[in-house]
Amino acid sequence: MVMIHIFLTVMVVGGVSLFPETAEAIVMGPSMQKLTWHYYKVYNTCENAENFVRHQVEIFYKNDKSIAPKLLRLLYSDCFVSGCDASVLLEGPNSEKMAPQNRGLGGFVLIDKIKIVLEQRCPGVVSCADILNLATRDAVHLAGAPSYPVFTGRRDGLTSDKQTVDLPSPSISWDQAMSYFKSRGLNVLDMATLLGSHSMGRTHCSYVVDRLYNYNKTGKPSPTMNKYFLSEMAKQCPPRTRKGQTDPLVYLNPDSGSNHSFTSSFYSRILSNKSVLEVDQQLLYNDDTKQISKEFSEGFEDFRKSFALSMSKMGAINVLTKTEGEIRKDCRHIN
């Protein structure tokens, strides 16, 4: 059975222990071994660091639920480029955040606020890279995701270059997407799971219009797109016919909308050919990801557990530890 296959995959990849009662996943693969669970408590450098982060996230979330998808995107943009080193937070005319793919990134204000609080409590101790990982975990948990363990002890990168940003277009093929995830040490289950982050948040119409009007340069809409959903999207995203035309935002998952809730309805929409982005819809075009999508649409807990594992794995990509990098005093600038 597919459910058993997925569950066993989650259990054995990277030496994983799952705790069904809390839907938490602990990853002890090679990259994670450089990090420590509750690092700041274990080494008695800032015992309540994670509590301080959580408190600030809870305050912010009450006023702005969109912080969950914003932080998810920010963490993805950081980890998938040069590793989880908070380089995406650095300011500068040629920094990563200035790359076209990073247009519209958000969440910086909350990270700044958390850093200020931690510098007051434990000066020069907690890295911006750890703050970003912890804050993302706490925000998506408030939105309905599991509160997975975040291993800590990361240090902050010293450079940030927009030329290194190779984040792919949301219109890439399944094979291209799979190749990209594999290059970061992630597998097919991770890809299908992490794309589920699109269960909340928004995107610009410019990333969707080709599906609506010029799929694969045919001058026609995507043939697989549900015709009623196609009509709805066309109303929100008119053809781009002139330079400087406004670029509206649309919800990645209309079912959750402004609630920005973490749900498995994203996968139900894939199975109904109602995905907003082409990269999401293409999960239906491969036998493995199609089966995973079916499992997740039918079993929310399976999705939550897999999400916990994949987020932990993503958060360990090319981390800096020990004497590498630095602990920034200001997340936007190196010391």
From Swiss-Prot:
Primary subcellular site in the record, as a coarse category: secreted
Oxidoreductase as UniProt keyword: yes
Glycoprotein among keywords: yes
Listed InterPro entries: Haem_peroxidase, Haem_peroxidase_sf, Peroxidase_pln, Peroxidases_heam-ligand_BS, Secretory_peroxidase
Any one cellular-component term (Gene Ontology): extracellular region
Cofactor binding mode and count: Binds 1 heme b (iron(II)-protoporphyrin IX) group per subunit. Binds 2 calcium ions per subunit.
Active site: R73
Known glycosylation sites: N216, N259, N273
Amino acids binding Ca(2+) 2: S199, D255, S258
Domain of life: Eukaryota
PROSITE patterns associated with the record: PEROXIDASE_1, PEROXIDASE_4
Matches recorded under Pfam families: peroxidase (PF00141)
Protein family membership: Belongs to the peroxidase family. Classical plant (class III) peroxidase subfamily.
Record's protein name: Probable peroxidase 26
Organism of derivation: Arabidopsis thaliana (Mouse-ear cress)
Lineage, top ranks: Eukaryota, Viridiplantae, Streptophyta, Embryophyta, Tracheophyta
Gene name of the record: PER26
